[in-house]
């Protein structure tokens, strides 16, 4: 049925012995030092990613245990998994990248915003929109997510595929699953990345044509495609493709947008667009509703009292109007606002001023703001998406048909959200093209 514990131990010992042999040979090499050519520097940067012998041995032991567990639970031949991970290694630089900022670090909303809402990304966004306009409109109609929001997310994530990461995803997830840096939340973070590593393996297995459970057979599975999937590039956190989906999100929310029978978030813009729309829809995006409202200047003290950093919709819009944080119009669905009973939260975006004093910009986040937070758990990120979308022409206000507000007996004199977006885009297409 499955290999015995003795057999598993032999495999693990073989892998550890293999690592020790490679490192020993490297240490004993009599090859004279090579000049720092570009090729040699690139090679060194890869070789130096490996950790010390003891760390690599522990890494191999833990990885082997996980592969055995997956083999048993999914009936995947263990040898196939071991072959796919034979060259897996820890990446010390990644452990540094995931460390929390130092105690003296100050969050800076203005710097963050400037990094993402800038001419290069906006120009690329307009080009991406023009190249995919018809499909974006189709996805907007199907999902209710405005095209500008989808374009903004992909632009902020990777500049439409220009920056998708340069780490092998199996190395990233293995490193963070078994060698996460010493932080207070280390156990929870390691478990998260173990789960993502499992998801990666199952994702790659099915992408390569394998079935689950596999019934101890690789029949129908293309091993080349399986290994290629494990070795694909990712961010330092293991996110993949144009929209930077984690493996679990790919398995749960990614869709085949171009209809070629497979999901490819790295090379297919249509797959990326459709997948972002599907993710947002499944996480509660409300069609025709705004993302956030600015706080009234004279109500900043009131907003400060309610801001607690907890991403929960705690207050009604009516309550925020009564406190002077929002205007009456923002609680009027027929005038670009939302219904008074709609729930909201106070969003605080801190930054230091030129003198180093702490300042905060406040917004009222609505349901759709929180949906964006589900994509990337950061208030900075969510508000940047909203403002990037506005720079592309997104109208951050409600767009609801009159019959939905007043009932079917009233005259319809308002277009749907998708129709307005299409009309707006056609009318402003010349303006939106890059200079």
Language-model segments: residues:
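Flexible, glycine-rich surface segments
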Residues: 226-344
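N-terminal secretory signal peptides that target proteins for export/translocation
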Residues: 1-12
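Acidic/His-rich structured neighborhood in mature extracellular/periplasmic domains
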Residues: 109-275
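Acidic helix-start/capping segments at beta-turn-to-alpha-helix junctions
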Residues: 79-105, 155-158, 167-175, 294-302
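C-terminal soluble interaction/assembly domains
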Residues: 298-435
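An acidic, Gly/Ser/Thr/Pro-rich helix-cap/linker signature
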Residues: 31-131, 137-140
């Amino acid at each position: 049925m499955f290999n015995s514990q003795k057999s598993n131990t032999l495999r693990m010992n073989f892998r550890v012995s293999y690592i020790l042999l490679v490192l020993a040979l490297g240490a004993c090499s009599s090859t004279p030092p090579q000049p720092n050519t570009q090729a040699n520097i690139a090679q060194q940067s890869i070789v130096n990613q490996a950790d010390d012998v003891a760390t690599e041995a522990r890494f191999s032991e833990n990885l082997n245990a996980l592969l055995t567990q997956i083999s048993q639970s999914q009936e995947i031949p263990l040898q196939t998994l071991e072959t796919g991970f034979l060259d897996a290694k820890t990446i010390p630089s990644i452990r540094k990248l995931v460390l929390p900022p130092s105690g003296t670090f100050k969050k800076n909303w203005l710097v963050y915003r400037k990094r993402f809402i800038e001419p290069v990304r906006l120009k690329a966004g307009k080009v991406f929109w023009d190249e995919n306009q018809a499909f974006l409109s189709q996805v907007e109609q199907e999902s209710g997510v405005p095209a500008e929001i989808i374009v903004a997310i992909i632009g902020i994530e990777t500049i439409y595929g220009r920056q998708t990461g340069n780490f092998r995803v199996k190395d990233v997830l293995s490193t963070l699953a078994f060698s996460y840096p010493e932080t207070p939340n280390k156990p929870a973070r390691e478990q998260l990345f173990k789960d993502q590593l499992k998801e990666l393996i199952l994702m790659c297995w099915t992408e390569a044509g394998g079935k689950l459970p596999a019934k101890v057979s690789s029949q129908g599975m293309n091993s080349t495609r399986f290994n290629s999937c494990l070795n694909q590039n990712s961010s330092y956190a293991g996110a993949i493709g144009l929209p930077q989906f984690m493996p679990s999100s790919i398995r749960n929310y990614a869709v085949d947008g171009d209809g070629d029978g497979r999901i490819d978030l790295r090379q297919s813009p249509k797959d990326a667009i459709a997948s972002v729309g599907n993710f947002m829809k499944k996480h509660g995006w409300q069609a025709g509703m705004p993302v956030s409202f600015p706080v009234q200047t004279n109500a900043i003290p009131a907003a400060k009292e309610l801001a607690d950093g907890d991403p929960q919709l705690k207050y009604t819009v009516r309550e925020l109007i009564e406190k002077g944080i929002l205007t009456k119009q923002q609680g009027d669905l027929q005038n670009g606002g939302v219904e008074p009973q709609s729930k909201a939260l106070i969003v605080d975006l801190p930054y230091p001023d030129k003198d180093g004093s702490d300042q905060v910009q406040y917004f009222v986040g609505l349901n759709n703001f929180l949906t964006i937070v589900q994509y990337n758990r950061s208030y900075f990120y969510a508000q940047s998406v909203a403002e990037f979308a506005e720079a592309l022409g997104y109208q951050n206000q409600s767009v609801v048909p009159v019959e939905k507000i007043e009932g079917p007996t009233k005259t319809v004199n308002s277009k749907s959200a998708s129709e307005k977006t299409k009309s707006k885009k056609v009318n402003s297409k010349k303006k939106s093209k890059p200079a």
